[in-house]
């Protein structure tokens, strides 16, 4: 599982979903959580926090947002050398096989379909951590 001091960026255009994700993370013990309302704002925060000790260590992003979709942000993250191994979880209502395949091919760490339970959310974060921290 991600250490409790992990710096997490939550990106969703719906404040209620951002609050749900933040509250779920807080209930799991995480405190260092920032948020963005769309992919563009998320990218700006990633760029602002790009020096050692300030970098985000986990991104949880919605797929469908204005300005920049989560999948487009994921592709930019994976194309940037410094972020190539950044755990990136897509949280979305998209569950069609083609969309899941597209996300996997783009390098998503885990894919969580809304609505989700706290248990599924935690299990997916554990899997994302394991994927990026293989011994």
Predicted regions: what they are:
Residues 22, 72, 95-110:
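Alpha4 helix (beta4-alpha4-beta5 surface) of REC/receiver domains from two-component response regulators
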Residues 35-48, 70:
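Helix N-cap/capping motif at the beta->alpha junctions
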Residues 62, 92:
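Active-site residues of response regulator receiver
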